[in-house]
Structure formats: structure tokens, C-alpha cells
């Protein structure tokens, strides 16, 4: 096998792997391995609950906003003008 054929095979293999990773079929598998789907799945569950007429408890789902409102160093600083 000559060098040009080898580079062509490597390039096509790399492109093929990129397409597989980015495809909707394989994305859940790789996302689960990397932990990337947790937030998306959580948000999808919230949307389904809202569409079914349910409510979402903001104290469980917006933890950072809860901390901001109590002045843990992330909220607005009240001071002199």
C-alpha cells in the first residue's frame, strides 16, 4: 500500500468516526459515557411535566438562583452610590 492510499484511508476513517459521533443515533451513547446528556434529559423531563399541566418546584431546579437571592457572594451587592 502506498502512502497516498494510506492517508486516504486514515482521512476517510476519521471523517466516518466524526459523522458517527455527531449522528443522532450514536450521540446518546457517547453523551451518556461523557455525562453530557444529564442536563438535557432533566430539562426534557421538566418540559414534559409542564406540558402535562404539572408544576416544577423552583427550589430544586434553580439551586443557583436560590443562592443568589440569599447573598452568598453571587448576587447584586448593595452599597453606597
Curated annotation (Swiss-Prot):
- GO cellular component terms given for this protein: extracellular region
Q: Where is the signal peptide?
A: 1-16
Q: Where found, per UniProt? A: Secreted
Q: Which residues fall in a compositionally biased region of kind Basic and acidic residues?
A: 57-71
Keywords from the named record: Secreted, Signal
Specify residue ranges for compositional bias: Basic residues.
Answer: 72-81
Q: What is this protein called?
A: Uncharacterized protein DDB_G0277453
Amino acid at each position: 500500500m502506498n502512502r497516498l492510499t494510506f492517508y486516504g484511508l486514515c482521512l476517510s476513517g476519521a471523517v466516518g468516526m466524526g459523522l458517527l459521533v455527531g449522528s443522532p443515533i450514536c450521540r446518546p451513547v457517547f453523551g451518556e459515557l461523557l455525562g453530557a446528556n444529564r442536563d438535557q434529559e432533566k430539562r426534557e423531563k421538566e418540559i414534559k411535566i409542564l406540558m402535562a399541566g404539572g408544576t416544577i418546584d423552583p427550589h430544586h431546579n434553580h439551586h443557583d438562583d436560590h443562592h443568589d437571592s440569599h447573598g452568598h457572594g453571587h448576587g447584586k451587592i448593595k452599597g453606597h452610590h
